[in-house]
A protein has these predicted regions:
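Non-catalytic accessory regions of SAM-dependent methyltransferases
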Residues: 1-126
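Conserved class I S-adenosyl-L-methionine
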Residues: 235-244
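Conserved SAM-binding loop of SAM-dependent methyltransferases across substrates and taxa
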Residues: 245-258
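Conserved SAM-binding motif I beta-strand of class I
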Residues: 259-264
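C-terminal catalytic and target-recognition region of SAM-dependent MTase-like enzymes
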Residues: 332, 346-408
Length: 408
């Protein structure tokens, strides 16, 4: 190990166990000794055990409960531009390995801690990279890292016309960062005039509004789950709740569904879903601007004949303390869907909340089925697409549950 110049934090046995097990976060409560002179916010520091054993190097976040986010466990690493270029190349080559070539034009290029870029998300939508930066260390690294992102993809023959930042996320306040959004100025380049682009996924085209859409503009993690729905949808009458911009509904319609109803509480989302249907020439679709919690019991009372229902709601909980209320919400919509479906119908149901674990989700589905006097026959259980990799030792990276079942 070469001589180190970074400040040193000594952590307790609890933190040591987590770090050795693969987790990259050091909480302030687990720190036994801090450097005599506190490092500057967003700079690097080493982390060691009570015996002085090196555990890793990471970015310091002085305003967060997560005091250090590791970026390396190699004491000989030098964190220069070449280091970050290698890491971007590694992340991109991973996507090229696990995704089909056609899916590389709309994929998650960087998935935060799972790619060893703590607090950074980078999504590719055709010719645009859309970023979200949720840690002060990554915020300070942008002038070095973002040009490298564009350079690495371009060197691989990919067209990248600009980088757009979606930093309008409340979590930034926990890092002492302001909320904002706008184009990142790549040196010597001009960015596109439009903040919309088009992507193709599973043969379906989508308009993506990366300035105003949810998160970075489009949910890429369900790409292969949408394909599973499309395979099963042929000939069915489908209801897609929480449709957002129509992704599951469009896949069902393109897959040969007899009729698809796409519902969402957001008028803006429904307008974009209608635009996407027109773009794909799909005429077997209807659209409802409705609250799913009110819509499902109404449809049950009116006797609407749907035999395939899709439930892909936004996260009902983003904290452990609200899990119980969230599970009640998940149970309500799943119970209502099971009541509405005929025996032999199909239910695709998902949760994108890390705190709503698979164990809790299955328990909820069993309770909903019992109350609805139905049984569930499991067809497929899936997770997020592999461009959102799950890093063992970091449970926060394992968040998406997707169940495709027959209701009998």
């Amino acid at each position: 190990m070469k001589e180190r110049a970074y400040p040193v934090y000594t952590v307790d046995k609890h933190a040591e166990g987590l770090l050795v097990g693969g987790h990259p976060w050091v909480y302030e409560n687990d720190i036994l000794h801090s450097p005599e002179n506190e490092p500057e916010n967003g700079t690097l520091a080493d982390v060691v055990s009570t015996k002085g054993s090196y555990l890793g190097t990471g970015f310091v976040s002085l305003k967060s409960k997560i005091r250090v986010r590791l970026i390396s466990r190699n004491a000989n690493d030098t964190f220069d531009a070449a280091f970050w270029r290698r890491r971007v190349e590694y992340a991109w080559n991973y996507r090229k390995t696990v995704l089909e070539p056609a899916d590389l034009s709309a994929c998650r290029v960087i998935f935060g801690e799972a790619d060893q870029f703590p607090g950074l998300t980078v999504d590719r939508f055709s010719n645009i990279l859309v970023t979200q930066t949720l840690s002060v260390g990554m915020e300070k690294l942008k002038p070095v890292l973002f040009p490298i992102l564009a350079e690495v993809l371009r060197a691989d023959g990919q067209t990248i016309d600009g980088i757009y930042e979606r930093n309008d996320e409340a979590l930034r306040a926990k890092e002492g960062l302001e909320q904002n959004k706008g184009w990142f100025e790549l040196p010597g380049e001009t960015h596109p005039a439009s903040t919309q682009t088009e992507i193709c996924e599973n043969g379906v085209y989508y308009h993506v509004d990366f300035e105003n859409g949810q998160k970075t503009g489009f949910f890429l993690d369900q790409k292969y789950n949408r394909r599973a729905v499309a395979r099963l949808a042929a000939g069915h009458t489908v209801l897609d709740c929480f449709t957002h911009t129509g992704s599951f509904a469009l896949n069902a319609a393109a897959g040969g569904a007899a009729r698809v109803t796409a519902a969402d509480i957001s008028a803006e989302a429904i307008a974009m879903a209608q635009r996407n249907a027109q773009r794909n020439g799909l005429t077997n679709m209807d659209f409802l601007c409705e609250d799913t919690f009110e819509l499902l019991p109404l449809l049950e009372r009116e006797g609407h004949p749907y035999d395939f229902i899709i439930l892909d709601p936004p996260a009902f909980t983003k904290a452990r303390r609200t899990v119980e209320n969230a599970m009640r919400g998940y149970k309500e919509i799943n119970y209502r869907a099971m009541k509405l479906l005929p025996r032999g119908g199909y239910l695709a149901t998902a949760s994108c909340s890390h705190f709503a674990t698979e164990e809790l989700f299955i328990k909820m589905l069993r309770a909903a089925a019992k109350d609805a006097h139905r049984q569930l026959r499991q067809i497929e259980v899936k997770q997020q697409a592999p461009d959102h990799p799950i890093l063992w030792g970091v449970p926060e990276t394992n968040y998406l549950k997707f169940f495709l079942c027959q209701v009998i």
